[in-house]
Every structure is written in C-alpha cells, then in structure tokens.
Amino acid sequence: MFQTQILVRFGDLDPAGIAYYPNLVNYLHEAFEDFFRGHVGRPYPELYREGLGFPTVKLEVEYHRPVQYGDHVDVAVVVEHVGRSSVRLRYEASVQGRPVFTGRNVVVTVNLKTFETLPVPDWLRERLEAARG
C-alpha cells in the first residue's frame, strides 16, 4: 500500500464550505500521480512525455463525510488487479484517521499518439504487483 497526503485548499470548496465533490476525484488522481512517483519510481509526467498514458475507463467514489478547508487528507493507494492492459486501483481517504471517501478506478495502458491499447509494460507490471493489497 502506498500513502500520500493532500491539503484541501480554499479554491477546492463549494458554497457550503466543504470540498466540492468533483475535487475529490481530482484528489484521487493526485494520489495516482504520487503513487507513480513514489512507488513506481517514474514520475507520471515523464511517462506522458514518452507517450505512455493511463486513461481512466471506470470510476467509483463513495463519500463518507465532508472534507473541509485545511484538512490534510491521507490517501492510501492499493493495486487490486493487474490485467493484460488494465489496472484496477482502490483509494482509501481519511482525515485524522476518520474515513472521508473511498474510490476505485480502472485505467488502461495506451499509446498517447494513437490511443491504441498496449499491454502493461513488464517493468511496470513488476512494480504494480509489488503494491497489490
């Protein structure tokens, strides 16, 4: 399992003063990018420049309690499954140990020039399998 932390900024809030729900999806993507940098060992922008992309093809988010301005959201990233060209990840987000939202997404490995599906590269498969939970 990989852990990262995200700070809730003023611009993330809705008129009710809590994090606007689409921003929680952005937090999941930030955790995904942090996972690539911290666990996979390859910054996501580097892979992007090399033409390797991971678009989300399925996304689920379940909200448990409000996320507020100034919260430090701890997000755990767990690899649930590595397929031929897809990866399913689970995200568990909490503030001070209390769950605030959970999510899952499936990403597919693609060539960014053609958007054709590619097999998960062997070097990446090895790193992803090491993070399976």
Where are these regions (language model features)?
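Terminal targeting signals and extreme-terminal segments of soluble enzymes
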Residues: M1-D74, E80-G133
